[in-house]
Every structure is written in structure tokens, then in C-alpha cells.
A protein has these predicted regions:
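Ribokinase/PfkB-type carbohydrate-kinase core domain
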Residues: 1-14, 75-89, 102-240
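Glycine-rich phosphate/adenosyl-contacting loop at the front of the ribokinase-like
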Residues: 1-64, 69-73, 248-249
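Conserved phosphate-binding/catalytic region of the ribokinase-like
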Residues: 2-8, 205-307
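Rossmann-fold NAD(P)-dependent oxidoreductase module
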Residues: 51, 77, 265
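Short, conserved phosphate/pyrophosphate- and ester-handling motifs at nucleotide-, phospho-/glycolipid
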Residues: 52, 192, 255
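Short acidic/glycine-enriched loop/turn segments that link adjacent beta-strands
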Residues: 92-95
Length: 307
């Protein structure tokens, strides 16, 4: 590890993704035939860890490996990335899901839960937390009714760790009291348009994100899709970071790729704006490839060109 790099603790799940392409999203009592696009290991945390590893950022692995077919594949892919397995479940396999995708990139997910809800104090205590660095977690874990120990563990994490939280579509299920208890001075929230509306209020994304940052004290990264992202920090003018235009294959894992790229930049000591720009670049590459596993290596990032 380079001395200038700070470690990133990645906490969450690895899931099996079976990606299907359908002509339109399904309705009751209808029959459709789907095209199988791929079978991949995904999951928010694993997607973030994969992006970090490919960009050679130091990762502390807080992702469960299950006991089953998907668990074997997760362990193999972790080994290929150079990630040491730290959490194993003795009986349950990893979660897996169908990702059903329309030609325009819109998709729905059907998930089969696995070992990813076993966040007990004794297991969390085995994750080696650095005194300085970053700690990533997603809303899929934070919203789980069994995740009380996990939420408290995050709140009790070392003061030198910046929490980078991507609530995702489970934001609606996360206890507002937990969000209010977060240490605002060291918490960064990454949200897409829908999540900004849910957390900050309906209306113009930038206006609402800026207001929330000023009133609540959080730093927000408001991801606005093909337009790029806004950085909203308390009592500061928002900063716009434009997107990179590419031919889109699908949007699976785009938000995870953005978080991974941004965290890689922060780990290297980049300014927040430059780190968000790196997140935009990594996300652009991922959406130009099928599925969520297209995070670039350093060489691929250097060779990246836009349309």
C-alpha cells in the first residue's frame, strides 16, 4: 500500500446476478420470453470493492462469503481481485437475484435472500477497522430489520473514518432516527435523483439537495444520471461535475461504479471534486458494458475515450 493512500472498508453483500433482457417490464398473467445476458457476481458492496481493486486502491474486505454455489464463485472472484476473505457463513449461500432489463436500460430486480443479514456484533468485531480512511455501506444492509448491530457499529466507528453511504432504493426502509444519529462531520451521502426526492423533498434535485445539506450538515453527492453529479456541502456553493458521454449498454451497477471510483480518488488524496469526476468516468465505462462487472483497470481508465 502506498503511504499516500488511505484504506477503504467495504461492508455489505456479494450477490449472484442473473441478467435477463425482456422487451418490456412484466405484467400480471402475461407470458414473455427473455434473453439471458450474463451470470455475474454483483451486489452493491462487491461492485464497489471490484472497482476499488481494479484501480489498485487498498480495500478492507467486509463482504460475506456464503456456503453454496454462489459462495464458491464469490470466493473465487475475491481471490482473483486479491481480496482476503474475512467473513464466512457456515450454512447459508450468498443472495442472488434476477435483473430484468428493458432495451432502454430500465430494470427491475427479484432477489432471493441469503447470508447477507448475519451482521452480529461478534462478526463485525472481526473486521479490522483502520484509524483513518473510509467506510462504505449500502442501504440494502442498513435497512435490514436484523441490522441493529450493524447500524450501531457504524455509529461507533473510529472518528478518523469517513462514512460513505449509498442508501439506494432501500432508503424508504431505513429508520430516520439512524440517519439523524449519523456523525454529519464525517458522513458523505451518495444519492440519485429519486433518493434525493425521498430524503430531501420533492422538487428540483439541486435545490433540495443544497437545502438539505445546509440544514442537516451532511455532504451530499447528488447523481443526476447522464447529466453528471452535484456536490452539495453545508454552507457552500454547490459544485457541478459533468458526466462523460458514452453509448450505454445498460445501467446495472452504475451507482456502485460511481461510489467505487469516487472512493478510489478519495483514497489517493484527491479533492472531492476530482474524486467525483473519477466516479463519473468509472460509471461511464461500466454503463458502456453489459452488467455490473465492467469496472475498469487503471490502464483501461487511461485509455478511456468518450463518444
Amino acid at each position: 500500500m502506498k503511504e499516500s493512500q488511505r484504506p477503504v472498508v467495504v461492508l455489505g453483500s456479494a450477490t449472484g446476478d442473473i441478467v435477463l433482457r425482456v422487451p418490456e417490464l412484466l405484467h400480471e398473467s402475461e407470458y414473455w420470453e427473455a434473453e439471458e445476458i450474463d451470470r455475474q457476481v454483483g451486489g452493491c458492496a462487491f461492485n464497489v470493492a471490484r472497482a476499488l481493486c481494479r484501480l489498485q486502491a487498498p480495500v478492507v474486505n467486509g463482504i460475506f462469503v456464503g456456503n453454496g454455489t454462489w459462495g464458491e464463485r464469490v470466493a473465487t472472484e475475491m481471490e482473483q481481485l486479491g481480496l482476503q476473505v474475512t467473513l464466512r457463513h457456515p450454512t447459508k449461500d450468498n443472495s442472488w437475484c434476477f435483473a430484468m432489463m428493458k432495451p432502454d436500460g430500465k430494470r427491475i430486480y427479484v432477489s432471493v435472500p441469503g447470508c447477507d443479514d448475519a451482521w452480529h456484533q461478534d462478526r463485525l468485531a472481526t473486521i479490522p477497522l483502520p484509524g483513518q480512511g473510509y467506510l462504505y455501506a449500502s442501504g440494502y444492509e442498513l435497512a435490514n430489520v436484523k441490522a441493529g448491530d450493524l447500524r450501531q457499529w457504524l455509529l461507533d466507528s473510529p472518528a478518523g473514518l469517513t462514512l460513505v453511504l449509498d442508501f439506494g432504493p432501500r432508503l424508504i426502509d431505513i429508520d430516520p432516527a439512524f440517519i439523524q444519529a449519523l456523525p454529519v462531520e464525517r458522513t458523505l451521502l451518495s444519492l440519485n435523483k429519486d433518493e434525493v426526492a425521498l430524503l430531501c423533498g420533492a422538487g428540483d434535485t439541486l435545490i433540495q439537495a443544497r437545502r438539505y445539506a445546509n440544514e442537516q450538515g451532511f455532504t451530499l453527492i447528488a447523481r443526476v444520471g447522464a447529466e453528471g453529479a452535484w456536490i452539495c456541502q453545508p454552507n457552500r456553493e454547490p459544485e457541478y461535475v459533468p458526466a462523460y458521454m458514452v453509448k450505454m449498454e445498460d445501467r446495472i451497477g452504475a451507482g456502485d461504479a460511481h461510489c467505487g471510483g469516487m472512493l478510489a480518488g478519495l483514497s489517493q488524496g484527491m479533492s472531492l471534486r476530482d474524486a467525483v469526476d473519477l466516479g463519473n468516468r468509472v460509471a461511464a465505462i461500466v454503463v458502456s458494458r453489459p452488467g455490473a462487472n465492467g469496472a475498469p483497470t487503471k490502464d483501461e481508465l487511461t485509455d478511456f475515450s468518450v463518444d
